[in-house]
Amino acid sequence: MYKNLEEHNRLVNKYLKIFFVVSLYWCTSILTVFVNKHLLSSDTVNLGAPLFMSWFQCVVSTVICFVASRLSRKYPSVFTFPEGNPLDIDTFRKILPLSVLYTLMIGANNLSLSYVTVAFYYIGRSLTTVFSVVLTYVILRQRTSFKCLLCCGAIVVGFWLGVDQESLTEVFSWRGTIFGVLSSLALAMFSIQTKKSLGYVNQEVWLLSYYNNLYSTLLFLPLIIINGELESIITYPHLWASWFWAAMTLSGLCGFAIGFVTALEIKVTSALTHNISGTAKACAQTVIATQYYHDVRSALWWTSNVVVLVASAAYTRVKQLEMMRQHQQRSTATQKA
């Protein structure tokens, strides 16, 4: 009886931890999207350099981690930061694939956000679950059940319905939609690669975030030039305004927070759970955006949101039941042994 009670308490604590981390991810992610959209498209800021903004977010994150690392060495009893050397060649070689995916993910993400509304922004991200299933099979050789595949099919239907309805509006952008899909693909790959990369840094999320952002600051520089953003930055009328850099710093802080919380959510749950959490969060974000920006959408447009949400929830439930069944089978086998 005591063993069952102890197991129950352990399970409750685990669920509470997961709930807290997922809630933190939701709040941080939604705030980041609205801040970035304000910087990219608002009448007051309208920077028009999404990759430069992504680069600056990585710079802020790198500085925070560097300062934390130095404080930890000087005041170890007050500050704690894992030991590591980002300039180590072996470390660079191991973490670089994750940094490439991270650069692609946040770069495509901000490019998409610069073209589409916040309300439609989630549509491209809704395919993350589908990409995750495909990549899990291609990379990890793990098969997915027929029920899960049906749910993925429904998600694709919801995605195309949303694109079809959005294309009827004046604010629709194919370029923004394509960048959104590309960001979803990068996120699915990033989630899988994160689990592997955490093993290289002894499961230290802070250290992985430090390496990842530092390497990404280097990767973004040629992309900024290729995207033709140098002229936009140099000729930007508010470049030396204090309020502009304050807004950029806030965006950088949000970027650091979302990077850390994303890695933390993957660590305490799984890559799949993180992808599903991101999709569900995006649906809530859509409702908030339509209210905040006073967007009026058609019934079919809202139907696409519902289809994606229900299909994602069904996928989550199916995966949960499959995991519970596997756990029971392992427990039964252990008891027999």
From Swiss-Prot:
Give TM segment ranges.
13-35, 45-67, 95-117, 121-140, 145-163, 173-192, 205-227, 242-264
Look up keyword Transmembrane helix and say if it applies: yes
Provide the alphabetized UniProt keywords: Golgi apparatus, Membrane, Sugar transport, Transmembrane, Transmembrane helix, Transport
Task: From the Swiss-Prot or TrEMBL record, give the protein name.
Answer: GDP-fucose transporter, Golgi
Q: Which domain of life is it from?
A: Eukaryota
GO BP, sorted A to Z: GDP-fucose import into Golgi lumen; GDP-fucose transmembrane transport
Family per record: Belongs to the TPT transporter family. SLC35C subfamily.
Query: Is Heme tagged as a keyword?
Result: no
Recorded GO cellular component terms are:
Golgi apparatus; Golgi membrane; Golgi-associated vesicle
Q: Which SUPFAM superfamilies match?
A: Multidrug resistance efflux transporter EmrE (SSF103481)
The job of this chain, per UniProt, is described as:
Involved in GDP-fucose import from the cytoplasm into the Golgi lumen. Plays a major role in the fucosylation of N-glycans. Functions redundantly with Efr in the O-fucosylation of Notch, positively regulating Notch signaling.
* A GO term for molecular function: GDP-fucose transmembrane transporter activity
Membrane disposition: Multi-pass membrane protein
* Cell compartments where the protein resides: Golgi apparatus membrane
According to its UniProt entry, this protein's organism is Drosophila melanogaster
What InterPro entries does the record point to?
Sugar_P_trans_dom, TPT_transporter
